[in-house]
Amino acid sequence: MDLGKVITAMVTPIHPEKNKVCKKRIHHLVNHLIDNGSDGLVIAGTTGESPTLSHDEKMKLFRQVVETNAGRAKLIAGTGSNNTAETIAFTKEVAELGGIDAVLVVAPYYNKPNQDGLYAHFVAVAEASDLPVVIYNIPGRSVVNIEPETIIRLAKLPNIIGVKESSGNLDNISKIIAETSDDFLVYSGDDSLTLPILAVGGNGVISVASHVVGNEMQEMMQAYESGDVKKAASIHRSLLPLMNGLFSVPNPAPTKYLLNQQGISVGPVRLPLVDLNAEQGTKLQAILEGLSK
């Protein structure tokens, strides 16, 4: 299955006065992302502030993105949680919606399952629905790391098609790529590791930076794929300050700040996250402006 090279982990537009998921702003953002380099979108993931979205808000978000997308980009819905039964029920509900190409299922957080528990969790979710499953390994947030051996075992299941790897461990990522089939998708979950992961055989990136430099991310991908590694490396180096700047305070506050500054109204972040202060915003804007110099 081809989900594309640059997949944007989409922020969730919130109405600034009503503090509600905003249909009009969703429509505008989806069109902006597709028109500016995104092959696919992850909806209601970490960058989409999934912990502070209600179930009903997530379903509203999915419906509106599906409607606006109209089949143009691949859509991946975040349905994971630390409750296996809840994840299964939510994934089934999303499957009935139509228009969703795959689900992103995060490693169960807080309850700290061992590798056997992680394996059983993903097997149960994958077997409960026909929607393809992308594993999300992010030990920095979930506390548990899905070991390469566990991912390699899971990759043998027909409905588990890939992994978003945010462990930052290139040795582990290389092992996964080497010991899974060619059609198992391995995506960088960190913008700054996109090029290194491509170099060891990865498929692309689930990106935050592509909200504002999606075309540049595509250019880097295309340069690498065409064999112009020097050009790809040059683009990577030029984008690195922005990639790091977007995580200077908790994500997605910096991304929302830049989008709002560019006229793509996505509103504020929800508590317990807070928006950038004036000093933080000025520094981030200077980084973005420095890319064109």
Curated annotation (Swiss-Prot):
Pathway linked to the protein: Amino-acid biosynthesis; L-lysine biosynthesis via DAP pathway; (S)-tetrahydrodipicolinate from L-aspartate: step 3/4
Function: Catalyzes the condensation of (S)-aspartate-beta-semialdehyde [(S)-ASA] and pyruvate to 4-hydroxy-tetrahydrodipicolinate (HTPA).
Source organism of the structure: Listeria innocua serovar 6a (strain ATCC BAA-680 / CLIP 11262)
Annotated catalytic residues: 136, 164
Annotated site, Part of a proton relay during catalysis, chain positions: 46, 110
Keywords: Amino-acid biosynthesis, Cytoplasm, Diaminopimelate biosynthesis, Lyase, Lysine biosynthesis, Schiff base
Residues noted as binding pyruvate in the record, renumbered to the chain: 47, 206
Gene Ontology BP terms: diaminopimelate biosynthetic process; lysine biosynthetic process via diaminopimelate
EC number(s) from the headed UniProt entry: 4.3.3.7
Assembly notes: Homotetramer; dimer of dimers.
Protein's name in the database: 4-hydroxy-tetrahydrodipicolinate synthase
Keyword Signal included in the entry's annotation: no
SMART domains, per the entry: DHDPS
HAMAP family found in the cross-reference section: DapA
Entries under Pfam families matching the protein: DHDPS (PF00701)
Family, as annotated: Belongs to the DapA family.
Record carries keyword Transferase: no
Localization of this protein: Cytoplasm
Annotated GO MF terms: 4-hydroxy-tetrahydrodipicolinate synthase activity
GO cellular component, one term: cytosol
Chief localization: cytoplasm
InterPro entries (UniProt xref): Aldolase_TIM, DapA, DapA-like, Schiff_base-form_aldolases_AS, Schiff_base-form_aldolases_CS
